[in-house]
């Protein structure tokens, strides 16, 4: 149900009908201003927060941030408003403001695991994986069953060149959330770099069983299959389809952004240089933008 919006937090001044001469000219009329009760302010703040949440779901992050800022003005002691504001600021590329909002939320509710997770994700996005690990682990001590936090922790561990820690985190993530193909895919990324090619192939096939159109496990599987003659025909078919879905994967820099290790990237370069893939590679190069926004968001 849509929240009811208050037309105004202050009523218009009352209109007085005063006969001429009824009031001595020395006395000015003082208009009456309605001061809303705290319960009304709270209702207004929560209604605005709901509207901001809807705007976030619609992808209107900047408008959501403006409404969320009004929410925290009305409800400065409610950590939920600060978390909402931080999320809107983060999605509208206001990282520093988002960090400040999360810090305020944590002051108000230090045992809220979600706030620690959000700070960890922000640190990861800002290229601070070591800080992200500390924040995420603290949050997981409060709520150890958050699959997304384990996934972020795995990504941070990968960036810190800790493949075993990353693999463990990704396995926990997929164990906690059914159908979490992104976590299964990333297990494959780790296993391939560790030289466990067969296990990596199994993971990527599992990921494609969940999401048959996911470009990342499709191309990674193609790369792994191309290592032996029996798999080369399937590999070229999968690679062509993957590049049609997500052309950015033709770029080595984009693969690196998606946490592909050096072994997988080198193997991908070999596969994509095959003459049978020239047309697919040329199309991908023409359409590639290098932007991470076009790929499935959780896979980084």
What annotation goes with each model-predicted range?
Residues 44-45, 79-80, 113-114, 147-148, ...:
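Helix-start (N-cap) detector for alpha-helical repeat units in TPR-like alpha-solenoids
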Residues 205-209, 215, 219-251, 276:
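TPR/TPR-like (Sel1-like) alpha-helical repeat modules
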Residues 53, 87, 121, 155, ...:
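Residue-level recognition of tetratricopeptide repeat
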Residues 30-36, 238-300:
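Terminal, low-structured helical/coil segments at or just beyond the last alpha-helical repeat
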């Amino acid at each position: 149900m849509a929240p009811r919006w208050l037309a105004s937090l202050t009523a218009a001044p009352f209109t007085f009908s005063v006969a001429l001469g009824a009031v001595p000219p020395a006395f000015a009329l003082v208009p009456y201003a309605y001061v809303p009760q705290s319960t009304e302010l709270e209702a207004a703040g929560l209604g605005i927060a709901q509207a901001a949440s809807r705007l976030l779901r619609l992808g209107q992050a900047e408008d959501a941030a403006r409404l969320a800022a009004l929410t925290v003005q009305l409800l400065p002691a409610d950590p939920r408003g600060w978390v909402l504001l931080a999320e809107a600021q983060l999605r509208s590329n206001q990282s520093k403001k988002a960090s400040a909002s999360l810090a305020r939320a944590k002051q108000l509710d230090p045992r809220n695991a979600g706030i620690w997770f959000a700070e960890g994700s922000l640190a990861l996005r800002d290229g601070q994986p070591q800080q992200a690990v500390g924040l995420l682990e603290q949050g997981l001590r409060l709520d150890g069953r958050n699959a997304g936090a384990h996934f972020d922790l795995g990504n941070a561990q990968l960036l810190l060149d800790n493949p075993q820690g990353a693999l463990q985190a990704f396995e926990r993530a997929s164990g906690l959330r059914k159908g979490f193909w992104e976590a299964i895919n990333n297990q494959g990324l780790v296993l391939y770099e560790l030289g466990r090619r067969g296990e990596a192939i199994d993971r990527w096939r599992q990921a494609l069983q969940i999401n048959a159109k996911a470009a990342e496990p499709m191309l990674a599987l193609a790369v792994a299959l191309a290592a032996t003659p029996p798999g080369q025909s399937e590999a070229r078919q999968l690679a062509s389809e993957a590049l049609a879905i997500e052309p950015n994967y033709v770029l080595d820099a984009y693969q690196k952004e998606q946490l592909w290790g050096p072994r997988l990237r080198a193997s991908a370069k070999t596969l994509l240089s095959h003459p049978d893939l020239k047309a697919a590679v040329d199309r991908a190069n023409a359409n590639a933008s290098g932007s991470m926004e076009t790929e499935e968001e959780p896979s980084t």
